[in-house]
């Protein structure tokens, strides 16, 4: 007998050699029916996995993130089975689960039409009704290649696997797919499925490879859950910054400018300017000094920093190393430049910490499949910064950085919408990370200890660190349910040594400083996208590009309308007047659609009494009030940065 420690701490004795599913059955038939996968000794495993020793075990149902992934992963295989039934000539690529659903990539003669998606969805339902058993089996490499010989993408995936790696397959009826799992025991639990859309996607995300047809879908154990999700999806579409941002005149794109290069229109530029001025003032108030550094540098700088070895594919390189005496690259980050500034003068321990901040224009060579609106772009503006400090100052400086981030998130009204992720290295991925296991473990332990001291509730993620050190990622879930990293705080153990950075300690000795890479608000473009979605375009008054709109009832009151505009502008309010010869009702409706916080109607009575008739986004029609009172009110609201 072996001892199984369950999630609630209870211990169950079972025979060795049982599968996770059989252990679930021994606990409860209901639990077994709803089981999607298991977490065995901290690792997600298939329900078919055999347990031979004392272990900790959590049975995951659809209510857990791990369970949802196994559930949707199974649904992706049902989709692939449906495609092979209806379109046997199409070739299989990959079909993972993703947040809130799944996708599968196929090599097709032409993209799937809406009618074909409907037929595939019906075929999936037919397969689910047949309820074939899902079987898992393993094969040696030569037999696996023979089995998949007619599926070129699967052959490539098998050849990519390292020697000795387990090569496993899952079979649904007569459909077989290469897959590591985990999967459900059967397809019957999938009670509701919906194919959402078909798009193009490059094989392995590489633009040099063939464009495949990617089909997105979602699946649930109850139809009511699918209905609720689809309803939420419709609401999300209304809030999507890519749609709203264009409708509200915040940004646009142009195919001649290029993908991933959004054009901020006057309203968008005003919003960014407002946020930028606020952040720069706040950073200076907290002891940061501003820098202004070049947009590019010689490859030599990036070779010292390690970006050339670990990040070159993500950079825009100008020139050819084999032909040109000097090769430059547009900067993907600011750190090497601020290190050069630090090294330009000598520093005593009394000078530390040094806190550099810069509003940096950065460039990253994102692939076309990764770019989205303002969230993933090729040129962006980052509130970047680096703190150079002694080991004794590290925890306080990290805490102060977290305090700044929390203040920014609270002021933006999104503090309750963020989560924290402690991102660590993967010791097996030496191409991505500086290969210094001792330094990694030491720095990760330091960061974990600091996070625990700060009582930060965080999750941990492997293989998500920067190449030079672990990081705390501040995550925000967008309207489509996908988590985006909006801010990172990183502890760097490597670059101070690479750049020869030092300070003189109290004994006159040279010592290596610690470096904290940080941002206060993240990438301004991504933050703007997040705010548009959070507020459905109705940005708080202090952020809104147009804070008040003055509407004269007719041309007779144009002079007074202009007088109101001038007084508001004099007090720093962003205001416009609408002098078009349109009916007042039409102009009010349009101003409301533009999410204008305050609409001020002026006519004969208002002009005579020096008043404005106020309609606020928050309270609706408020009636007439003295102009001076309204000006003081909106100025105070803006100054307090009310949400």
Swiss-Prot record:
GO terms for biological process: threonyl-tRNA aminoacylation. Keywords: Aminoacyl-tRNA synthetase, ATP-binding, Cytoplasm, Ligase, Metal-binding, Nucleotide-binding, Protein biosynthesis, RNA-binding, tRNA-binding, Zinc. SMART domains: tRNA_SAD. It is found in: Cytoplasm. Binds 1 zinc ion per subunit. It catalyses: tRNA(Thr) + L-threonine + ATP = L-threonyl-tRNA(Thr) + AMP + diphosphate + H(+). Its main location: cytoplasm. One of its GO terms (molecular function) is threonine-tRNA ligase activity. It is an enzyme of class 6 (ligase). Homodimer. HAMAP family: Thr_tRNA_synth. This is Threonine--tRNA ligase. The gene is thrS.
